[in-house]
């Protein structure tokens, strides 16, 4: 692939790591953010120490606060901003962009109030004449590992296979490999909903439960993620892939996962307010829990783990009581769909 110019919107941990991947592949990378101190740090010291204390970025990675300058003549735009501001940033892009570009996103969540997937938001806010079919970049990927060029394999999903293949070639190299998929609904819902299960898995660890319990929540969590995804139109096969069970394993078992760490702290008795204050990063699983719970209620999808975590986070239910309720639910067959 010849050199491309890519705007990365969001200088967080994942946006920074993906910027390095693109730079390693010889592309021109422009990071956009709205914190002048952070942008100045990236340009002056080639660091982003809030997320990576010991990493020095290539000096060819340039950061901007001016969106128009960032988007000038770009071939592709990658959204890596928190879910709650995706619509706002998309509106700003639509007002600024003056040519057609490949539009990608690598965020994982559902819009809190509308319960919409992020590709839907981008489709609504960015006119068709300015964009491709949206490409979702998702899968088992800790930024802390990708930034040091550890092996990472994820998925590029788009309704248009050719566009997904463009993104596959854009990112793939000797340590970072993408597979294509056309099941956008499946890939997006898997990436969003696994954060909820990761909070639950972390809570079990914080409470002192062992590996048996952690394996159970991942397996049963995958089952309810799949139920909701299929109700929305996804293929159940997607959930057995990288963006499904792969992402759930890496997020639901690792200290690198902020959602897992948040759950662990909840299990140890910390308040949600203290957890969010101490984390210093967005915990997508918190807001996604409410969106997924409300969506499941609307569609009549059985999601007992999500419901339990929702009750703990939003109604103050004791975690041990929530676990007790799940363990005393009506008996079911493992492959029962409801």
From Swiss-Prot:
SS bond partners: none
Annotated residues for binding of sn-glycerol 3-phosphate: 108, 139, 141, 194, 247, 257-259
Family, per entry: Belongs to the NAD-dependent glycerol-3-phosphate dehydrogenase family.
GO cellular component annotations of the record: cytosol
Pfam families: NAD_Gly3P_dh_C (PF07479), NAD_Gly3P_dh_N (PF01210)
GO function terms (MF aspect): glycerol-3-phosphate dehydrogenase [NAD(P)+] activity; NAD binding
Official protein name in the record: Glycerol-3-phosphate dehydrogenase [NAD(P)+]
Native species: Streptococcus pneumoniae (strain P1031)
Phylogenetic classification of the source organism: Bacteria, Bacillati, Bacillota, Bacilli, Lactobacillales
